[in-house]
A protein has these predicted regions:
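Alpha-helical transmembrane segments of integral membrane proteins
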Residues: 38-298
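N-terminal membrane-entry
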Residues: 28-40
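Soluble extramembrane regions of membrane proteins in the secretory/endomembrane system
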Residues: 1-27
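A broad "ordered helical/assembly scaffold" signature
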Residues: 3-4, 32, 236
């Protein structure tokens, strides 16, 4: 009775029923994964050059060596090679997005969307490397979720803190230590919330998610909507975006953007719509927050 009732409900909803058949095996040729790998390691070398401009030869040779290792691994253990390349892309492109030429744009809008486009390029590389039947049906999946959420933040903080090394030899007020402790606790909470088996979601957040899904069909990700993208707006409207301390928060949105496309079993159109909603509404929330702050100062 249960199966008959379920079948009737599915048919009323517009679904057709029939005999279950296995998916045909499909995998792109290794050459396409190799091309994607070359692009990923080129981006990694470019970011390394930005971090260490006086180590140009080392950065370039490191990129070539990493690509060679990836090609060998692609022949020996193709799934591991794909997962490794996708992880590198998920780490590098959010960082690269916040170090790009878009900062030289004159308007906040162009700066904002330039960063998003670099991250979308990273998402494209993730999709290219994670293609294949076993990944599409989730028999295998993206590995390194927590690394992809932590390493970009650490790299962005490193780039901002490098000019401040002299502070290590100075007396630090207690209030700064308290702020650092609170930031550390927030970081622990952030890491524990990542992945499929993190901290449980609060009931209020569940209700908010359901409301957005009913309203928009696909809800934007919370980290992008309420945290990352508004922070990106704040950073991009500053006089020196590349030095803004909003960037460690802004990169969370770029990480989440790329991470959306690691869920390769999800329809690409759904991931694109979700990303667009997050970028649009995040920008609007950032703009509204600035206007509210300016109004409050008056």
């Amino acid at each position: 009775d249960l199966l008959e009732t379920l079948q009737a409900r599915l048919e009323r909803a517009g679904f057709s029923t029939g005999r279950a058949r296995p998916f045909a095996s499909w995998n792109p040729g290794w050459i396409w994964t190799a091309v994607a790998g070359a692009g990923i390691w080129a981006a990694a070398a470019l970011y390394a050059l930005d971090l260490f401009p006086h180590r140009a030869v080392l950065c370039l040779w490191g990129g070539f060596l990493a690509l060679a290792v990836s090609l060998v691994l692609l022949m020996v253990a193709p799934l591991l090679a794909k997962q490794g390349l996708a992880l590198v892309a998920a780490i590098i492109f959010p960082c690269l997005a916040l170090r790009g030429a878009g900062f030289r744009a004159k308007t906040t809008l162009w700066r904002y969307w330039s960063c998003a486009l670099v991250s979308m390029l990273g998402a494209l590389f993730v999709v290219a490397t994670l293609s294949g039947t076993e990944l599409l049906v989730k028999l295998q999946e993206f590995r390194g979720v927590k690394l992809a959420h932590v390493i970009p933040i650490a790299l962005v903080v490193y780039t901002l803190a490098r000019p401040l090394r002299d502070w290590l030899n100075k007396d630090v007020p207690i209030r700064y230590l308290i702020i650092a402790a609170l930031v550390g606790l927030a970081g622990v909470f952030y890491v524990l919330r990542t992945g499929n088996f993190g901290l449980p979601v609060m009931n209020l957040e569940v209700q908010a998610r359901e409301f957005l899904e009913n309203l928009l069909f696909v809800r934007p990700r919370t980290k992008e909507l309420l945290l990352g993208h508004p922070a990106l707006y704040f950073a991009m409207r500053s006089r020196q975006p590349h030095k803004s301390w909003w960037l460690p928060v802004a990169v969370i949105g770029q990480i989440s953007l790329v991470n959306t496309f690691t869920h390769i079993h999800t329809f690409l159109s759904v991931s694109l719509l979700r990303t667009l909603y997050g970028l649009l509404f995040g920008y609007v929330l950032g703009w509204l927050a600035v206007k509210a702050f300016d109004w409050g100062k008056r």
